[in-house]
Amino acid sequence: MKFTFKSSFTILLTIFSIFLVFLLNEEGEIPILFNLLTFAGIYGLAAIGLNVHFGLTGLLNFGHAAFMGLGAYVTVLLIPHAAGREGVVVTTGLPFFLALLIGIISAALFGLLLGLPAIRLRGDYLAIVTIAAAEIFRLLVRDLESVTGGVYGIINFSSSLQQYRLGFIDNFASSNDLNPSQIWVAFLSWTSIILVLLLLRRLTNSPWGRALRAVREDEDAVRALGKNAVWLKLQSFMLGAGIAGLSGVLLAFNYGTIQVSTFVPILTFYVWAIMILGGVGSLTGPIFGSIIFWVIISETTGIAQLIF
């Protein structure tokens, strides 16, 4: 990361934001801090995926919630769970990490399917298509109650992930009066961020990454050089969608339930706000942007009631 004035200011603002959490909460600082870090990790991961779309390639995606939701629903439906108004119990399923892999791939493939007809569109037209796709996804999930649980959602799936919880998580949680399930999700979220950033750093410094930035700056020039700009944008769309799918899974396991009301348009705009706060096009910017965003949310009581 190159430390310019902008990046240094963002880091200082992030540190100040965390300090503000302790300053404004006289009791229970540690639980509040870890609640903030959990949401910051999950949404930061989602913003990294969006940054691949817009910051790296210049694609206006306003349907990010659909990618998050698809990854979450596919993963949860493939493991033991209870769904719908009647609480229909499914006792068999795949191992969690295999289901997670399928969920991520499903989100990436949805990015491919959405991108095939839409990726040739530019600017506002692509934004409109992605918003429409996200709403179609949400309505389908709501209406397919026999599969997705509809408005009643899906519950009793958290044990598939929690059974892999590491011992030091329980020790740390018990010594600090924290929820071990949430600490485990927070640990996985920030571990995922590190792994994804390492992958993206390698990719963005490769010829492929430079080609994506060229598409963002001047797509016609890329075509003139003999590069397939459409295929490059599709690859970017798939990669960002897969990362979003992973963040959606973590969001579902943090709540312990998955409902259609979670993956609404406002979720996409939260992720956009985080990306912009951290700096569009910056690999690590979404992390700082997410922390700043969630400090603002947690310390603004009226808004926090809408989220928590």
Model-derived segments and their meaning:
Residues 52-71, 120-126, 257-264, 283, ...:
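Short, non-helical or kinked segments that cap or interrupt transmembrane helices
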Residues 61, 221-222:
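Short hydrophobic faces within alpha-helices
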